[in-house]
Amino acid sequence: MGEERWVSLTPEEFDQLQKYSEYSSKKIKDALTEFNEGGSLKQYDPHEPISYDVFKLFMRAYLEVDLPQPLSTHLFLAFSQKPRHETSDHPTEGASNSEANSADTNIQNADNATKADEACAPDTESNMAEKQAPAEDQVAATPLEPPVPRSSSSESPVVYLKDVVCYLSLLETGRPQDKLEFMFRLYDSDENGLLDQAEMDCIVNQMLHIAQYLEWDPTELRPILKEMLQGMDYDRDGFVSLQEWVHGGMTTIPLLVLLGMDDSGSKGDGRHAWTMKHFKKPTYCNFCHIMLMGVRKQGLCCTYCKYTVHERCVSRNIPGCVKTYSKAKRSGEVMQHAWVEGNSSVKCDRCHKSIKCYQSVTARHCVWCRMTFHRKCELSTLCDGGELRDHILLPTSICPITRDRPGEKSDGCVSAKGELVMQYKIIPTPGTHPLLVLVNPKSGGRQGERILRKFHYLLNPKQVFNLDNGGPTPGLNFFRDTPDFRVLACGGDGTVGWILDCIDKANFAKHPPVAVLPLGTGNDLARCLRWGGGYEGGSLTKILKDIEQSPLVMLDRWHLEVIPREEVENGDQVPYSIMNNYFSIGVDASIAHRFHVMREKHPEKFNSRMKNKLWYFEFGTSETFAATCKKLHDHIELECDGVGVDLSNIFLEGIAILNIPSMYGGTNLWGENKKNRAVIRESRKGVTDPKELKFCVQDLSDQLLEVVGLEGAMEMGQIYTGLKSAGRRLAQCASVTIRTNKLLPMQVDGEPWMQPCCTIKITHKNQAPMMMGPPQKSSFFSLRRKSRSKD
């Protein structure tokens, strides 16, 4: 039989769909409730085939926005069109999609596309409510082949909601067992607790559909899933129960990786954390020693120890993963190397001769210290942690807590879910500074996910925490009694502020210093701390070595209190009550708010720094002509340290309150001071005299705020592009009070909102220890400029 293929979305469209899913606050289960009584889709039957109009309504309920017309149409066609057939009866295994295209396929695609376009045309409500008869006499599909076509060539295309829901649920984050159970109940339409062969094939076809988008080679996955289906039906009666379905899925590792393996609970119990990977150089299976082949993702690789296997070998009797903690703390216990064989195309650390990638049996490397040796060259069995020993928590430094006193709980505590959570004690190596790594996987697109995997390998997985799993608190509690530990915040400025808030609430006797690995765009705080505007794929080992030598600086943090007037209606929720970077009101907040609203509606248009800059330019240009915040002085009152600032003679459209010398991704609104004329004030008295303000220096640890006026969007653009050095200096003070009498756009640390009439008070809260990045190396041209300025 010829191999059948789905009509697929393009990779760009698939990325679009993923971004819409990530930005939506709803889960697929929430969208299904719209078909219940009182929901927006109550007039439709979810068990019947649905038309394009109902499909659009369902996607709007799920994603909370309307999909772009091309993406919506193509996604609908992906579920309604006939699968494409190979022209040959015996196709080459692993053939590309392009080889499957034929003239008949193109005609069929064009015919269906025309019908979909007709279906996409505005219909009356009666047409939208029209239902198609269910295909009850469907022929049972053979295992692992696409289902029977569900649209006739003479009728408008329709889709089955089950297929759409199953497909979308695979894109969502969540536990694999929950996804398996959800898909089972979704296709168990008669609610008898059993799935027949055709229903299981429909589910597996959707899994293969997703696998192709993730660049998996289905030639390996297809027989594994087929074997899984055969193994589930123990009594060979053609039906599978929920228990059999979940058990079969949870014991098939490639399927777990496809569903999104949850490795949060496997840090140290000997279980591997598998991920599909494409290898850029020849790589061999650690089990069978045969090279991994394929043009897509060729095999499974453990995130923790880099043990690599074929998909077919992963279920064999392979060695367990490295242990990340010691079972019991014994006096005098020493750390031994944890060896992994093969795939080390580097030089031997003893004889300094090259190790070939195929020498899987003759060479191995240590997971902890990264030392690589030929077997004949191995020296001591003792491991000291290697070049990252100052940061890494070796397994001998972590042991479970034991309680010997009567009446106390055993070696763990019960979580909110009723699960037993192990508690640990950290006894670091003397003279070291263990590093707590907190990663926001959503920052920088998928950059955060890659950073998380890399740190899992570079350090002990137990000291690396995913902020999606409970936020910063679990990591801070794990390190609570650890002396001299440091924190690395991987994410944007919002992530850093979140971590600093949690450190405040944790009530540490001594606050740990925080370094920043900036992800995404903006990152004004990271720029001021010399960590750069965004991680661009450099060596993480070098960044960790820089943290070892980082000097400390105290960062001022400010309390932001917004007091609305009693007679006005409630506006948007204030994003933060603490300010770390800046607060602004007026023209720049208006542009930021429009940018924020547009990004929520169309996240796929904001997936690069260049696109973000172009959108800011467009919004800034339109704001220049609209001037929505002109005559700002008529609508606000400004007080600095209790003294009013006269704005009547100044034509401003915006006011910014600065704590750090960076805004809008590196722009300094306060401006630079000549070093020979700058004055660092020791007193905390406010300054509003324009002559004195010329010599006031901005410092993120002086417990002072800088107040700057903006004349409009045009001036903002000039400052951003360097055509103008700074805005208008209004004051330098220790507290600010602003009163407004109309609805105005505001933003704090890059998060905008619309605020009705209110009183805003900004006062000093505390200081947080931060680590500075290494000084930037001066280039030849910067040295020339400095020498000219001295002359």
Swiss-Prot record:
> Any idea which GO molecular function terms this record carries?
ATP binding; ATP-dependent diacylglycerol kinase activity; calcium ion binding; lipid binding; zinc ion binding
Polar residues bias (residue ranges):
94-103
- Segments forming domain DAGKc: 430-564
Residue ranges of the region described as Disordered:
82-103, 117-154, 768-791
Which PROSITE patterns does the annotation name? DAGK, EF_HAND_1, EF_HAND_2, ZF_DAG_PE_1, ZF_DAG_PE_2
What EC number(s) does its UniProt record assign? Answer: 2.7.1.107
Cite the record's Basic and acidic residues compositional bias ranges. Answer: 83-92
The job of this chain, per UniProt, is described as:
Diacylglycerol kinase that converts diacylglycerol/DAG into phosphatidic acid/phosphatidate/PA and regulates the respective levels of these two bioactive lipids. Thereby, acts as a central switch between the signaling pathways activated by these second messengers with different cellular targets and opposite effects in numerous biological processes. Has no apparent specificity with regard to the acyl compositions of diacylglycerol. Specifically expressed in the cerebellum where it controls the level of diacylglycerol which in turn regulates the activity of protein kinase C gamma.
| Record's protein name | Diacylglycerol kinase gamma
Annotated source species? Homo sapiens (Human)
